[in-house]
Curated annotation (Swiss-Prot):
The gene is CASQ2. Its main location: other. It comes from Canis lupus familiaris (Dog). GO terms for biological process: regulation of cardiac muscle contraction by regulation of the release of sequestered calcium ion; regulation of release of sequestered calcium ion into cytosol by sarcoplasmic reticulum. The modification Phosphoserine is found at S397, S401, S405. Interacts with ASPH. Monomer, homodimer and homooligomer. Mostly monomeric in the absence of calcium. Forms higher oligomers in a calcium-dependent manner. Dimers associate to form tetramers, that then form linear homomer chains. Interacts with TRDN. Residues 373-410 have a biased composition (Acidic residues). The lineage of its organism: Eukaryota, Metazoa, Chordata, Craniata, Vertebrata. Calsequestrin is a high-capacity, moderate affinity, calcium-binding protein and thus acts as an internal calcium store in muscle. Calcium ions are bound by clusters of acidic residues at the protein surface, especially at the interface between subunits. Can bind around 60 Ca(2+) ions. Regulates the release of lumenal Ca(2+) via the calcium release channel RYR2; this plays an important role in triggering muscle contraction. Plays a role in excitation-contraction coupling in the heart and in regulating the rate of heart beats. This is Calsequestrin-2. Keywords: Calcium, Glycoprotein, Metal-binding, Muscle protein, Phosphoprotein, Sarcoplasmic reticulum, Signal. PANTHER family: CALSEQUESTRIN, CALSEQUESTRIN-2. Phosphorylation in the C-terminus, probably by CK2, moderately increases calcium buffering capacity. N-glycosylated.
Length: 410
């Protein structure tokens, strides 16, 4: 009887827990919201939505692993479509083989990519194919390209954004032709780069902005760069941002991780791992910031900072690939072609390198004194020796064969 009472009490508690509302994570409800895009329905679908999210994929083969991988991607898209159902966003898939003509028309050339059509723009998503990352990316994309700052509290919030590129301009009003040019320029980089503006003289004074002036903030830098030759056209602003788009120190973010990784310097990245929430990681990041600030004018220097907390699924892979321990800060040089790497020796967490020691190590990397090819050369030498041995063996075999032939002739 006692067990029966406990069982009933357990069921009651379980029912009570399920009745709680407010923290229900979405699960796929089974409804199909993602459709296949074809030449026939393209115009109809395009008219229906302000924003269209397209997954361009290779034809699904009979291979079971490939089918599973495709189904996982499809479920992610279905869940994102479900979560954003109240927004004016459409979700479609384009088969590379069946719809080759349509793909060519849309300019799609990379199978497995996700593209977003918004107005006359095509934005390629270069981030982690995960539901939460995609939802945040799309929500940022449908917002206004420029965020307006009206108060000192909003200035404080603006100043706290330190780990990404941001721009802010001071204009007379939203009707100003120079603000409109700024807004048009912002659309080129949305949602990856944040554009802010103010029409408030008090805010402009606090930020040391002059009328029609735009300041460019590089990540982790104390002072902005005032874009020269104001007022600017849309084209001038776009050109300036593109020229300064590779910061001295940049954070690897889930929403644009592949774009950042592909933006290497001569085939290598200087990579730093540091957990911001960890005291040693925080200290190491502060040292990295100091090095970046002291070397911000060096066009050959760009450090990619990775917080392992942002990529829990990749930690084991990185530790195995780079042969490092990510429970402590690390900095190394990585070859993006084959993932060969060389890492600075950091004895322990209590003996982190100083900014000067870090600069000396980085100088050795940039000069080529420290590089990822040394091990390859050693392995290559071993390989050459083996090849020579093989050649010798091969020659001996030929000689033996010739001897055998002579014997047969006799």
């Amino acid at each position: 009887m006692k067990r029966t009472h406990l069982f009933i009490a357990g069921l009651y508690l379980l029912a009570s827990c399920r009745a709680e509302e407010g923290l229900n994570f979405p699960t796929y409800d089974g409804k199909d919201r993602v459709v296949s895009l074809t030449e026939k329905n393209f115009k109809q679908v395009l008219k229906k939505y302000d924003v269209l999210c397209l997954y361009y994929h290779e034809s699904v083969s009979s291979d079971k692993v490939a089918q599973k991988q495709f189904q996982l991607k499809e479920i992610v898209l279905e869940l994102v479509a479900q979560v954003l159902e109240h927004k004016d966003i459409g979700f479609v898939m384009v088969d590379a083989k069946k719809e080759a003509k349509l793909a060519k028309k849309l300019g799609f050339d990379e199978e497995g990519s996700l593209y977003v059509l918004k107005g006359d723009r095509t934005i390629e998503f270069d981030g982690e194919f995960a539901a939460d990352v995609l939802v945040e990316f799309l929500l940022d994309l449908i917002e206004d390209p420029v965020e307006i700052i009206n108060s000192k509290l909003e200035v404080q919030a603006f100043e706290r954004i330190e780990d990404q590129i941001k721009l802010i301009g001071f204009f007379k009003s939203e009707e100003s032709e120079y603000y409109k040019a700024f807004e048009e320029a912002a659309e080129h980089f949305q949602p990856y780069i944040k554009f802010f503006a103010t029409f408030d003289k008090g805010v402009a004074k606090k930020l040391s902005l002059k009328m029609n002036e735009v300041d460019f903030y590089e990540p982790f830098m104390d002072e902005p760069i005032a874009i020269p030759d104001k007022p600017y056209t849309e084209e001038e602003l776009v050109e300036f941002v593109k020229e300064h788009q590779r910061p001295t120190l940049r954070r690897l973010r889930p929403e644009d991780m592949f774009e950042t990784w592909e933006d290497d310097l001569n085939g290598i990245h200087i990579v730093a791992f540091a957990e911001r929430s960890d005291p040693d990681g925080y200290e190491f990041l502060e040292i990295l910031k100091q090095v970046a600030r002291d070397n911000t004018d060096n066009p050959d220097l760009s450090i990619v900072w990775i917080d392992p907390d942002d990529f829990p699924l990749l930690v084991a892979y990185w530790e195995k690939t780079f042969k490092i321990d990510l429970f402590k800060p690390q900095i190394g040089v990585v070859n993006v072609t084959d993932a060969d790497s060389v890492w600075m020796e950091i004895p322990d967490d209590d003996d982190l390198p100083t900014a000067e020691e870090l600069e000396d190590w980085i100088e050795d990397v940039l000069s080529g004194k420290i590089n990822t090819e040394d091990d390859d050369n050693e392995e290559g030498d071993d390989g050459d020796d083996d090849e020579d041995d093989d050649d010798d063996d091969g020659n001996n075999s030929d000689e033996e064969s010739n001897d055998d032939s002579d014997d047969d002739d006799e």
